């Protein structure tokens, strides 16, 4: 009888210990995921702010008479087109204007000039309309589904956008959520 009571106590204590460890581990994973997500948010916001600063430099050069506005815009677009971030250089930025026209996209140059007002993801999310709302609010994050660089895979993406007022440009970048969770 004592042996059975001792065995039962050990089993109960073991189960409690395992339960505690599992809860602790889940809490640590959730904290890590939150930290990683905060890091991604900070990364994409920082990249956009860097791009806006570069665009601002070209704008100032046009205002000073060093470049025409068109020359400044073309140079700014080409610099932003070449900008990459992330270890694998998968991070890039694109520019829409406030009339919803694609100004520059390094992966989809054939779509430049197209109006994207009605661009909608598979869940009915109006991608560019939401991006514009965030940019109009001083900058912000959006989530939507978009085709990956392979041209086939559609995956959820988290993006950050800000507006460059003098040229009515909205600069955006984002990361695919599944790429972020793979790292976690």
Language-model features: locations:
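Extreme N-terminal signal-anchor transmembrane helix of membrane signaling/transducer proteins, especially
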Residues: 1-24
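Juxtamembrane membrane-water interface segments immediately C-terminal to a transmembrane helix
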Residues: 19-52, 63, 67-70, 74
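Membrane-interface helix-start motif
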Residues: 29, 36, 178-184
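Short N-terminal helix-loop-first-beta-strand/juxtamembrane motif that initiates sensory/input modules
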Residues: 42, 81-102, 139-141
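Extracytoplasmic/periplasmic sensor domains and loops in membrane signaling proteins
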Residues: 66-79, 108-149
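A short beta-strand signature within small-molecule sensing/ligand-binding domains used
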Residues: 91, 128, 151-162
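Amphipathic coiled-coil signal-relay and dimerization helices
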Residues: 101-107, 154
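Short, hydrophobic beta-strand elements of compact beta-sandwich sensory domains
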Residues: 156-183
